[in-house]
Amino acid sequence: MENAVMEYETNEPKHIKVRGAKVHNLKNIDVDVPLHKIVGIAGVSGSGKSSLALGVLYAEGSRRYLESLSTYTRRRMTGAAKAQVDEVLYVPAALALHQRPGIPGIRSTFGTGTELLNSLRLMYSRLASHRCPNGHYVPPTLKVAAEQEILCPECGAKVHAPSAEELAFNSQGACPKCGGTGSVRTVDLDSLVPDDSLSIDEGAVAPWNSLMWSLMTDVCREMGVRTDVPFRELTDREKEIVYHGPAEKKHIFYKAKKTNQAGELDFTYFNAVYTVENALAKVKDEKGMKRVEKFLKEDICPECGGSRLSEAARAPRLRGIGLAQACQMPLKELVDWVAGVPDSLPEEMHPMAESICESFQTVAKRLMDLGLSYLSLDRAAASLSTGERQRMQLARAVRNRTTGVLYVLDEPSIGLHPSNIVGLNAVMHDLIADGNSIILVDHDTQILSEADWLIEMGPEAGAGGGYVITQGTIPQVIAKKESMIGPFLAQTADMRIRKSVAWEEIFAPGKLHLSTDAIHTVKPLEIDIPKGRLTVVTGVSGSGKTTMVLESLIPGLEAKLNGEHLPGHVKSITAEGIAHVKLIDASPIGINVRSTVATYANVHDELRKIYAKTADAKNKKYKAGDFSYNTGKLRCPVCDGTGQISLDVQFLPDVDVPCPECGGSRYAREAWEICYENKQGMRYSLPQMMEMDVTTALQATQEWKVVHQRLEVLKNLGLGYLTLGEETPSLSGGEAQRLKLASELGRGQSDSVFVFDEPTIGLHPLDVQTLLQVFQALIDNGATVLVIEHDLDVIRNADYIIDMGPGGGEDGGRVVAVGTLEQIKADADSITGKYL
């Protein structure tokens, strides 16, 4: 019998067998992916890594899992189409952690997202000392959990112990004033009269111009306010009437602007504040909100002080503090506080307290491992950086202690400082120890070198990729000369490709200066940024890079350029000669299938004009507008120019398939007949052009100057492998970021500041070199480039480095070191310096 058991164990499959994968650019590949191991997938951007990991392994794993559920359940899930692959054997149920977790809503906090708040609410419901209706506190008792009656020992009144649900700010425990969001929108008095040198007749009161009839100035005059003197010369009483005057009916004479006819009316006075409040109450859509928004400001809710909780939910006490205070502690302190909870209670409550606290501690430990110990539970999830949100997702996945699941991690190193990666590795090994498998798509050599097996895709991007070039253990891959990642894993590749600038010359072209007060966990800062140079902002996760650049510098510069008030925490900002500030981040471009590479890069309009001038088009009287696949006559009549149709299958999810009429080209048959003949005698139709990749199209468009230039820019950005008709929503983060840059390159930029938020996301070390050349091109045009980055290769190429830290959260938020690469390396305080 023992032999039989042994035999059974050895027959277990060791690999996921993929045969004939053709998703996106995969070239019909066969590959065996080891199970119960960390399998890295590397390769240049666009070489087919995500196609293999997400398009084949995850798509099939999640689809098969869904197909094993009942039809009824499946109807409620979004359907997964079958991947284009001959067969995939032994794939486990799969979970994917995407590059960019969605931005959470206003009601989501670090506590709700990690579900730590659930355990904490349970503690406060079952273990806390509750308050009787007359304000006396009752000592903690087991009667709460047993749902027995509790009487106050002081006055004998019946005590109601709130359930965990009644302590939730998204449910019954919400503060009635702000509805559990912690902030209220109030009218910003400063914005109502932006220019007090104007008189009311000249339009000094802004909301009356845009949100109200212009008659209000006449009514205001009847209220006893002088409307023909500059606003600043009005008495306090007159200003009070403008801002807060009563809603009285007045009889006014008015003259119609157009006809010059006089008339009389009874009209009720709306003061400036009420005008805004009234408009806010009637807002129905985004556009209406935009008009009102500029007169509002977000304030912390005066009733709950931003804690989001009602008075009753803030009442229970545990170890002397309420739930609101517990949520304000950084995780590190909260963990120590929770550890002391059981001992603060009567003996008979210990077993229950220990089990509740233990469930809290296991989740918290994971988050601490991933370097999130500095976040407090009440931190709004929307204000976290991408990396922080992704690690929240990861911790949630690990907590469930599942087994036999395939985790597909898409670039988990995003937003991780080299010193945080150690914690990530520990989490991956725990997942494997529980009997799971991991697929890891990444470029960070520090993470890839943890993999037990590496599959390298390539050799090029786009059409030239989609093959497996090498696979094996890390030493095996390094030994193979065809491997492109090998030299970077072995650290033999040379990464310094920009000439460094001498320290004396760095600030020669001028500088920007930023001065701020404290906000979040960032202390007050004074920062200089050299103009016309490549400045990199570094530091561990949570050290305040995002806050300094995205919440202080950019809004400050924008406000200064538009002549608006600086954000509250920004004291001053000097930026001589700067006229534009552009943030280039990696958020996806458009969620619409109608947006393509050609439309985004402004090539499509030019192509339509060219085709409208051909003899074929003139004979059939087609104009440029007819060549649009969105609205023109020549779009495909079946799919309306989207290139795909949705099939409605009874009881099953809708399936999107390429349009049978146009084959995905988006154009009707007539469009294929209109061709342009170039000097080499080659004939192309517009649908054919849209199917070319940028590199091929460059050859075909040599005589069209504008199109050629624009495509050349895409090629120089390393996007030569994208087809012109490719949908922009399907691009990876790194591709989206570089496509946004396309319109900026190639013109003088001495008055512009470009800010990049982790541009190396999705970039192979070889692509990083392309990116550095792009930065150099911007700087050669006179631009100032500021980059938030963890990638050591980019940091090594910086002219000037600002290192934040030293830790994350409360331990961070200061500038630890500034200077050139050599100065940072030599600085003992800089954590980043140690890794350089």
Where are these regions (language model features)?
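Conserved phosphate-binding elements of NTP-dependent enzyme cores
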Residues: 1-836
